[in-house]
């Protein structure tokens, strides 16, 4: 919303908004994935215009976690489905009402990964992770990595729990857990754009509901309810 506020204004404000590193990451991911999916699904839709239209709408919907779909991407080639699957983790920018891990966390995790690889070859060199022009302290990087670990662990645990019903394959269960934690909307196959979650039993629906709440609250508030030490008065 901060970026939206700066975009509504003079030409100088628009130029300032473009300087936002998070916005550049967001647009970069959107354009790159849209172009890649367009090429993958081009044989399926015949013309570049049609392929681009379907690809851009689905990518925008997934990244903004709006939940709309104009095509059943469960029927797209594997490469396109893999890209959609990865987008479900990402979400939109920090401060937005969208779900997902958020662009800022993805960017910092990427930069931390690059720094770790470089440190392997240059152990004596001091390397600082920078985001939005400022150095990011190691405490924040550890917290970001911890959030990512909990995020992925919750998805995997949720997928395993709902798999005990034995109704759907691994792709359906994993995408169902992921789309609930990220609050995306549709998943793949039976829970894809042409389907819904009605086929799951009561137990799975409770698990998926808890995953949705956890994702909407950014995980930790829900986990705090399971941590008895926080219940006591200090």
Residue ranges and their predicted role:
Residues 1-14:
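Single conserved hydrophobic/aromatic residue that forms the stacking wall/gate
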Residues 6, 33-98, 164-215:
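P-loop potassium selectivity filter motif centered on the GYG triad
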Residues 15-18, 22-25, 58-63, 106-137, ...:
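Juxtamembrane inter-helical linkers in multi-pass membrane proteins
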Residues 16-31, 143-152:
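Alpha-helical transmembrane segments and their helix-start/interface "positive-inside/aromatic belt" motifs
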Residues 18, 22, 46-47, 77, ...:
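Membrane-helix interfacial "entry" motifs
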Residues 94-95, 103-106, 215-232:
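Membrane-helix cytosolic exit motif
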Residues 96-122, 159-164, 168, 176:
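Transmembrane alpha-helix/helix-exit interface in multi-pass inner-membrane proteins
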Residues 147-164:
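Extended C-terminal subregions enriched in glycine
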């Amino acid at each position: 919303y901060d970026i939206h506020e700066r975009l509504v204004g003079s030409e100088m404000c628009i130029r300032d908004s473009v300087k936002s590193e998070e916005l550049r990451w967001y647009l970069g991911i959107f354009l790159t994935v849209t172009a890649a999916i367009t090429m993958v699904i081009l044989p399926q839709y015949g013309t570049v215009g049609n392929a681009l239209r379907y690809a851009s709408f689905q990518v925008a919907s997934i990244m903004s976690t709006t939940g709309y779909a104009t095509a059943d991407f469960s029927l797209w080639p594997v490469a396109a489905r893999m890209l959609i699957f990865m987008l479900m983790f990402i979400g939109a920018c920090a401060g937005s009402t969208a779900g997902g891990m958020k662009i800022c966390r993805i960017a910092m995790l990427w930069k931390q990964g690059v720094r770790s690889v470089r440190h392997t070859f240059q152990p004596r060199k001091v390397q600082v992770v920078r985001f939005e022009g400022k150095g990011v302290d190691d405490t924040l990087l550890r917290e970001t990595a911890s959030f990512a670990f909990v995020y992925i662990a919750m998805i995997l645990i949720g997928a395993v729990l709902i798999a005990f019903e034995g109704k759907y394959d691994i792709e359906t269960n994993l995408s169902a857990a992921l789309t609930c934690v990220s609050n995306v909307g549709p998943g793949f196959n039976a829970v894809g754009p042409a389907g819904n979650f009605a086929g799951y039993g009561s137990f799975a629906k409770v698990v998926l509901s808890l995953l949705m709440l956890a994702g909407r609250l950014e995980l930790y508030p829900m986990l705090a309810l399971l941590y008895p030490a926080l219940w006591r008065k200090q």
